[in-house]
Amino acid sequence: MKVLDESKLRDYVEQFNIDDEELYSNISNEETFNFLQKNIPLFECPDVDFERTYYFRWWTYRKHIKKTKDGYVITEFLPDVPWSGKHNTISCPAAHHYYEGRWLHNAEYLDDYSYFWLRKGGEPRLYSFWIADAFYNRYLVTLDSNPLLDLLPDLIENYNLWETGWDWKGYHIGQRKNGLFYTIDDRDGGELSIGGHGFRPTLNSFMYGDAMAISRIANLARKQDIENEYRSKASKIKNLVQDKLWDSESKFFKVLPKEGGALKDARELHGYAPWYFNMPDSGYEEAWKELM
């Protein structure tokens, strides 16, 4: 039984279509109402701005669902951009694609996208990408563990490659001897940040999130040795982030530019990244006073 009717969805789609100059067409404006009607949860609330934003995000999201010879992918930009990978994909925003797209009723779109990243020419390490965490949190909505379990070896391989690391324009991205992960801000989706290159709260939070996700996927697969191994990895990262990246004076997570150095003297929004993965213990919440 439907609780909400589709009249609001139709009204919003018609408004958005009128205001749009349609230059790129994967799922056309003409097809959008039928597509969203079949694929998204309907939503209604007293705040019209919030409601309009909800439907606008879905109206926009479908523009980026792209059919390719490797199945469906989700793009960040509609026009091709030179810093993208195969099929104009970019790993930097990909986890957000899963967190939003997990509510799509047709699982084919993100199933294809998952296999693309790990087996069909995607470049999941071109930018920071909490891929295992994104896959697992999608599973919590779909409850279909088949692609998750099938891709577990690939997720482990991806994590191992982050640990080994690689050289990028004179820098070594990956895990260092101190146990933390190093990256440059551009590869972390934070180019021109004040904190700059180093052991950043972002990437280290992402690796914590991925380690926890792999542990949970291994639990579904009944592979206790892998479950324990990755839970231990997550615990070590958590302790290091709290010990090395927390500024006890300004009460904030910051960038550590180099091993043995001092933390950067800047509070940036990415200092809240650890809470995205529910990582910090109690006692660190004073950082949130900056937003109160």
Language-model segments: residues:
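Substrate-binding groove/exosite segments of carbohydrate-active enzymes
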Residues: 15-152, 156, 254, 259, ...
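Short amphipathic alpha-helical coiled-coil/interface segments
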Residues: 54, 58-61, 155, 227-245
